[in-house]
Amino acid sequence: MPYLYRVAYDGALFHGFTGHSNSVEAALRRVFGHLLGRGSRTDPGVSAVGNAVLAPSRLPLGYINSRLPRGVWTWAVAEVGEGFNPRRARRRRYLYVAPHWGEDVEAMREVAELFKGTHDFSSFIQFRGERGTPPVTTVDEVGVEVAGRLVYLYFVGKGFRNKQIRKMAWAILAAGRGVVSRRYVEELLERPRPGAVPSAPAEGLILLDIEYDVKFDVDRGELRKAYVYFLEKYRRLEALAAAYRAAGERLLFYDDL
């Protein structure tokens, strides 16, 4: 009987989810022997708290995690039927986080609204040689929130194509900075031009959740280990950011002498 496992990981420590010896999938394969499928293939640098993998056997989550490298955890498991495909999810939820440097919030929200619904997203996809597949996808929700010095972009849909979220994030942020107009983005959706839009940095993207019609058994102890890791890393990076800011301000002080 196959089992579906929830997986969280720090994307900064791995060369993507798959396709490399230092990938998250490679680390999981070394524990399970082999895997039967995955929920989402994330790029190098992209983190996740709710990705999923399908494995042929049930192992204790603590046992799995004790054999995984630092920065990746399984924290829940569900028994599923034969033939279950983890790619066929109800919804996927992503969050993109970026610094807020005064971007126009309303301009960002106007562009975010354009992405809702069903469109040909060729301008916002990096093709992997699958041009025979229609690049039409449906985006259910796109949200823009600003809190303090950060911009939070939320994306919800059944599925997204390669680099699609990072390219949409770039367009939203660029609109807030006045780099592109709402009309420019509309034209890219109406008359697609592959390669017209760059990707926002991978490090700002997090796969929050993949929704399935299954009930997971959550190991709160293993879940907390992942939580503590991310909290401690946040605190370290916050202190590092403050140190860099202080260094920059000191350099300006010398410039005024």
Curated annotation (Swiss-Prot):
Q: What is its EC number?
A: 5.4.99.12
- Catalytic residue list: 43
Keywords of the record: Isomerase, tRNA processing
Residues the record lists as binding substrate: 94
The reaction(s) catalysed by this protein are: uridine(38/39/40) in tRNA = pseudouridine(38/39/40) in tRNA
Instruction: Give GO BP annotations, semicolon-separated.
Output: tRNA pseudouridine synthesis
Query: From the UniProt record, which GO molecular function terms apply?
Result: RNA binding; tRNA pseudouridine(38-40) synthase activity
Taxonomically, which superkingdom?
A: Archaea
Q: Where does the chain cross the membrane?
A: none
Q: Which residues form a coiled coil?
A: none
Q: What is the recorded function of this protein according to its Swiss-Prot or TrEMBL entry?
A: Formation of pseudouridine at positions 38, 39 and 40 in the anticodon stem and loop of transfer RNAs.
Family (UniProt): Belongs to the tRNA pseudouridine synthase TruA family.
Q: Which named protein is this?
A: tRNA pseudouridine synthase A
Q: Which organism is it from?
A: Pyrobaculum calidifontis (strain DSM 21063 / JCM 11548 / VA1)
